[in-house]
């Protein structure tokens, strides 16, 4: 009986574990959500840098640039999350897992899946928690991340569709304030946070 109970607990934990190795859906407060998001973004940053190295090895320069740009965006997000955590009197904590690196196509698929999860499930739930607590700082950092993750999911999808025809951009631009990521900017400022275009970080 005890063995069966342990198996059930393990299955529940697996169900609630997000792509960064954290139990995002178990967060009950905005602080817990911030810690989960910080952990997730920290793991995503490490994972995308590893994926970039593999893409370089596989000869996909554009995909490598995309992964590096996404890693920089996740760095922006984890920095923003950490700042709010500290303002709430806590210290950010991350459990960095060794990334599982496969071939570049599989890495793109895994990355897109993680971004879709954050876009459709994780960050909307975290924003709701922050709204319930009227935590405006948490709402802001979550909304910044949500906007960027949606863009990352789209960019990964485009990269998958163009993986073999070499039509993937070799340079990307990342907003240093919200992490918005794009190949080019259509205006003079970030469409998410209004940071001037000249402050964007160029990633190759």
PLM region descriptions:
Residues 1-4:
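Positively charged n-region of N-terminal signal peptides that target proteins for export
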Residues 7-17:
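Bacterial N-terminal signal peptides
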Residues 22-204:
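Non-heme di-metal
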């Amino acid at each position: 009986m005890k063995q069966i109970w342990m198996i059930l607990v393990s299955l529940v934990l697996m169900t609630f574990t997000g792509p960064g190795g954290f139990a995002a859906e178990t967060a009950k407060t905005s602080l817990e959500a911030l810690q989960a998001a910080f952990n997730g973004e920290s793991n995503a940053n490490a994972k995308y840098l590893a994926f970039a190295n593999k893409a370089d090895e596989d000869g996909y320069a554009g995909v490598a640039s995309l992964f590096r740009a996404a890693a920089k965006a996740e760095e922006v997000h984890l920095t923003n999350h950490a700042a709010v955590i500290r303002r709430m009197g806590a210290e950010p904590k991350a459990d960095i897992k060794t990334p599982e690196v496969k071939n570049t196509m599989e890495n793109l698929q895994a990355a897109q899946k993680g971004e879709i999860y954050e876009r459709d499930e994780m960050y909307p739930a975290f924003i709701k928690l922050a709204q319930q607590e009227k935590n405006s700082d948490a709402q802001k950092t979550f909304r910044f991340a949500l906007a960027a993750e949606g863009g990352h999911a789209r960019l990964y999808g485009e990269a998958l569709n163009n993986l073999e025809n070499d039509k993937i951009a070799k340079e990307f631009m990342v907003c240093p304030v919200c992490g918005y990521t794009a190949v080019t900017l259509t205006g003079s400022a970030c469409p998410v946070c209004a940071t001037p275009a000249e402050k964007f970080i160029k990633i190759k």
